[in-house]
Amino acid sequence: GNATSERLPTDPVYPXV
């Protein structure tokens, strides 16, 4: 979960954060 650079089914993405 890196802002918008990492999108994995097991790692939810939090924009902005």
Swiss-Prot record:
Its main location: mitochondrion. It is found in: Mitochondrion. Coiled coil: none annotated. GO terms for cellular component: mitochondrion; ribonucleoprotein complex; ribosome. Keywords: Mitochondrion, Ribonucleoprotein, Ribosomal protein. Putative component of the large subunit of mitochondrial ribosome. This is Putative large ribosomal subunit protein YmL35. It comes from Saccharomyces cerevisiae.
